[in-house]
Amino acid sequence: MDKVEALQPDLVIASLSVPGMEKNIEELKKRNLPYIILNPAHIFDIADNIREVGRSIHRVEKAEQVATHFMKRIEQIRLLTQNISERPRLYWEWWPNPIYTPGRTNWLTDVSELAGATNVFADYNTDNVKSTHEQVAERNPDHVMVVWCGIEIKRIKTSMITDRPEWQQMTAIRNNNVHILEEGLYCRPSPRLLEGLEQLVNILYPSLGASLDSQITTPSAPPKL
């Protein structure tokens, strides 16, 4: 925090998406550093966060352009997947020991549904669920999505998932549907969730391939603040 203060920022954009960040907020207060806190629960909240940042840095018009572009992309994907009847069931793993996975009030449930799937723990009306290998096996997901927070993909071996004895009869394991994904596209509630959403659609529906990509129109690069 000393280094942050030394930079004399006009604004610090803080987040509460990672446990323990409250201490940083207290330090910002003590040092009288200007800050805002972004803490979106759903993917749709990110557009409002973009607008909030725009107001804070006096870039309201530009922020509205960015937010509108973000929501337009989401709507394009929703329209592509809305008529999918047989939706695969996804298990998202944030952390392996103990197991943590997103519940109903988390952006990854939104991402799952927009991509034409469901979150197997969406019946928990919370943002974060502490579970067990046995409970996951009982829910028998079609796909396992591994997004360990703060862990690089290269450090995660598929065998860490597939060798779990409790999961040997799970559909996802038997069908080799274990996906090691870049956690920055899924675990951070930011505009990059859109990249993760598009990636997820292609993972779940590979037969659509280029046809799916071509329907997600990108007439221009997203505007920047």
Show which residues each predicted segment covers.
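N-terminal ligand-binding lobe of clamshell/alpha-beta domains
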Residues: 1-225
